């Protein structure tokens, strides 16, 4: 037997080797450990060791004596010192030896010894009690551990130290019986971390309490009440092996007190102990749970932390004594941050000794063999270590997740849907009962963020940043070390130095170093140069990065041409490295080639994937291998997945298949995805051997594949890895087909991965099936590629890679070196001068903070998802901010520096806010204020955020705060000189905390309630930019995933396609999908979008927040500020299409397109839909670039003239306002600023989707979450339609409307009719938005002045079968006034005086209540339509009849209100499909925004009217002085002019807020198109009347409520649009609802002609309006002409193609005849 001490030390060095030794050595080691510790204890403690030893031995079962010795042992046990073993302990050692035979790790053995006496429960509880008493009498913890007075000595089961195993107890001990997991019968023994104690359930209830009595720790009282199932946990926590604690702590000379518990776990200790007290005390009660969770995580996920005490110490040491270079060294990538030279030293010896262990499917299959013994210490093969020494596996029970695809299996972890990236930040997802699965999945799937596992390179050159961000999209490839290209990128082919050597501690090492000039050195003053370093050891992590020359203390002068001595650079960066051992590499090209191989050894872009075919009723490996041929469903799947290739002669990646003799089959399946080549080993394509049931020829290939796809036909039994026997198969992706070989074929996916394979994306949405489509194919290919990459991180493959790496390094160090050492001399480096220079040139303070790479700090981060604190490494580069958990070595948080909006810094902590106000809370490890100061300074350098400001707000006499806030938490308006204004609150400020509650966790409604109800309102705000625009994250301003403009055949950017893409139909399994709109989807028969929307269900709220964009973006490209992305709230049915996708997929960024003004405005999506459009035959369907141009110009002109461009509230138009522009008076504070963003699902993928349209929100348009506004009445959605609501009725069109209005169904139940401002708009907007830009929200937006560019979508003919979103329905409200002909039956909204016109889009799923009654109002927007595209006619469109949603009945209304409501989704889908054709996003104006301003203005116009809600909830308005009016804005017709340009100009939230305040617009007055022939005099009169109305609350009723022209130049379009313009079809253009007569009528209706003169603005507006109308008319004419030309061109094209084909055929015939004739002649 080898010397125990020696082996022990080796184990320590290796860190993880402990479990790999056989029992005998382990015993010896343990003895050694124990002896050393005992000795130490004797020295320090009173009782003699001998006595203790004898007692413990004799007692053997828990006698009191036992306890005594145990105490001392425990005290020092964790300390691995060099004391020699003592004889005193011999007896105990002997006993220990017995236990050791079963112990798994050295720690376990130690523990067992320590626990021997007491652990033994065989003696019964009495003994135990005596034991405790005795121990207590003899020594109190106070005596032994001064710092831990209350820790019971209780030696027994308290071990919490990492490797000790509870199950290491005497074979005879009764404990064994108790130490069995009641669920599995498995012996509970320690794995790593304190988890072992957690798993230990041996204690009986009485024993447990006896133990508690012994400890006498009050803290545990509450635990006693915990269900008995957790005793093991208590065991682990309660005075958790104070000895172990003490051991580790003593080794450092410190104790840790965590919430009253001594909890020292080697895996968790690190620096945490020091910090924990600080953090933990803040939340003492949650500690246990969090610890429990944490432990569990450590145990199940990271065997890496099974450290022996020595390794622990090294880690602790590392945490305490960071490298000198840590701060100044800028890391290139994530794995470099994880590089730990101390760990490399400790594990070096282990490299050659790592054994292959049973992993993958074999581990699972072997557990069954000894059925009863799964839980025993012995594995099926005889040794747990054999089974999985990597984790010291005890019988793993699996994760308990099962479904009809896959069953829970030992040693495997399942992904059944809903799993997402870990979230530690404080966000709504973590704060509410969020279906984390869905939300995470979707967000991660659709968001522009890089997933945690997808973050690799942190240093991104400025010129590559846009491209880099674009790469972060659809289906991110994860777990790939892209930093491996560091050498190739920065060294290869350039002047640099390589040094190789064999370090006595590190083994073979290789260093590459290069000095380079810093490109962007202006701010860095002296930092003209930096040194790039790549340092490689046998460990797989490499130190890669750069250090600025000014940050290096040196004897030489900085900034000279010669540079600093390399020796000084290396000594500073890697002080642990022995520079003397390094020799310069030989000058051979082979050196660089070898280094490239070494660095890129882990990169592979060729993967082989197995595919097993499982028929109905099958589940076993043998059955699957014996399926000789594929069925039609499997063939269909294979055709989708890749292309069949003939193997013979195949020259690409063949994955060991025979391409010469067909011995492995004649064909195989091959495909490529991104940069990857995939060859599939398909079981049915590999040779079948009828006489060999095992089908070895097939298994030979598939069994050696790491990732296997298991294809299940309907009726197949759930898959379990237990049925597979293979050491290599680590991941199984199960794909089950539904409705095979039909148009509705779809697939559900599940994953089962070996427990040591980290999770990987893309996440599987919960309860969703994927339609057969290219998107599903991309999803599946990304999943298997990520699975392969992740599997290579498992211990088995890492061990193999490490051995290979070590050999490479050895070869370099031995065969490719010269005798030259590292150059230490520098010309003229005199010692004296050097010393002076060193002082003088001492690293320039904070020079490193200007580095491009990631500067790293040790911090403690608050994990809000698990309510725990975790020790992390914080890295901040020029592109990313990320946190890596030290224990798991996983990235747990990342965000782009561009998304950081602010931070709150304290002395030793900092809270960083990003995106929409989400935040991460960090504190320094050693309460080091310097760290926080540096972090803040670094943030200032790399982000556009700022320090937050805390202020306490007072209420005025009316209880108002004096400002409005939109759903995003952005202050839309502040009452001048009010209390809020005096406190320093300004428009554009962003609230991130209200009364200590993070705004990111609140819905708009909750936010408003908090502001309204809190006695003292304390807010933390982020000040706006200098120009007054709110600070926004980049992902809010523009959806990153707009990239990869490479289009696929469908015209959709390939990268963007997501499984949820609009062309795909996702079905939420549980819910029936609504009938999809017919659309050209790649797969015939697949409905355009189905339930996919459900996917989005994630949270409506989530999306809403970010609707607004920062107006700063010049191009307005931001499609949706918030990335509103995926979150459109799909209805419960989820059937709604996924809106967000559209944004991604369908359009590149519409905004961008618009911006360009290029005709291509049609987004890809639009193009995709072109077919549909054509079907509708609305030429207008297509967007032409010009309109956008035009609009932009109008906008600019008008706005600029006004100067309101930025300020005009109109700009605020919220696109998202689906709902009636969420007048959120409910917002109270937010006071209508909020637009309902929620409702509007942005990016739902509908054509109408603003995102698609590219009309992203105009200037900060904040889409309110409809939440607060829900109560709003559907403010008349139709601007024009406002007729009902507005006094002015559009008589001329009234009849038409009448029909539509007639939707009498709802009439019957007027009371029931609710238009939720949010929902109605959502619905209508949703529909409208989707279908027609004119939707409620749209309309309202329009009216608000937002110009909504019509969506190009043509009105789909009814044939499409869905209501035309373009239809407008008018609902009259309580106001008795009805528009003639329009809703003949007024609907009374309770409390609402106004009538509203509601344009609902019929949700696809919901039957239109009286469709027949509803008539389309095709003419409404005709003029605008042209521009916006007939499809947009949304509101007005005639198809509405059938499709129109009538007024909603109460039930429908409620449904709409529910985010999940299928109606909403359907509507949404529908609209989006039609309406969204236009690439531009329609702009929606939010009443609320306006109202805020107007209220503030105090002018009667007060926007208050603008929001319907306002009237209803006047009190909501925080400060408005004027009574709120319900005014519904008339929906704007799509302002055909391109909204895109508008977009830029107005970003709602931001701009509008500010603008509003500047311009008071009395409610917006809709201006009719000149086409209507409206007389200007009438217009003036109307305006006056309008003003007069303002004075009257009823004015609020005016649906019009159009904003000022100036602000709403776009809105003027609305009227025009409203005029039932010509249908795309060429329907005659209906005069605007308001004709001159109508105009008068309008005034008449108003009845109150207000004499008040309009200010000079009217004249100005008139001029602008005339010009705009003229331009508009011209544009329309041009557009009509262009449309006609396009149509002709198409026809000509078709004709030419036919003629071409005919000519070709004739030519062919002629040729044949010619040659035939010649042949005959010859």
From Swiss-Prot:
InterPro entries noted in UniProt: PDZ (IPR001478), PDZ_sf (IPR036034), Rap/Ran-GAP_sf (IPR035974), Rap/Ran_GAP_dom (IPR000331), Rap1_Ran_GAP (IPR050989), SIPA1L_C (IPR021818)
Amino acid composition bias (Polar residues), ranges on this chain: 45-56, 360-377
Positions of the UniProt region annotated as Disordered: 1-29, 42-72, 360-401, 1067-1245, 1330-1360
GO biological process: presynaptic signal transduction; regulation of small GTPase mediated signal transduction
Sections of the chain in a coiled coil: 1654-1712
Record keyword Phosphoprotein present: yes
Basic and acidic residues bias (residue ranges): 1-12, 383-401, 1164-1183, 1194-1217
PROSITE patterns named among the record's database cross-references: PDZ, RAPGAP
Extent of Low complexity compositional bias: 1093-1102, 1119-1130, 1219-1236, 1337-1360
Positions of transmembrane segments: none
Keyword Hydrolase: no
Residue ranges occupied by any Rap-GAP domain in the UniProt entry: 595-812
Modified residues (Phosphoserine): 148, 379, 383, 1029, 1244, 1461, 1472, 1478, 1488, 1549, 1552, 1591
Protein keywords: Coiled coil, GTPase activation, Phosphoprotein
Annotated SMART domains: PDZ
Top-level lineage group: Eukaryota
Gene Ontology CC entries for this record: cytoplasm; glutamatergic synapse
Annotated GO MF terms: GTPase activator activity
Domain PDZ span(s) in chain numbering: 950-1026
PANTHER family membership: RAP GTPASE-ACTIVATING PROTEIN, SIGNAL-INDUCED PROLIFERATION-ASSOCIATED 1-LIKE PROTEIN 2
Protein name in the entry: Signal-induced proliferation-associated 1-like protein 2
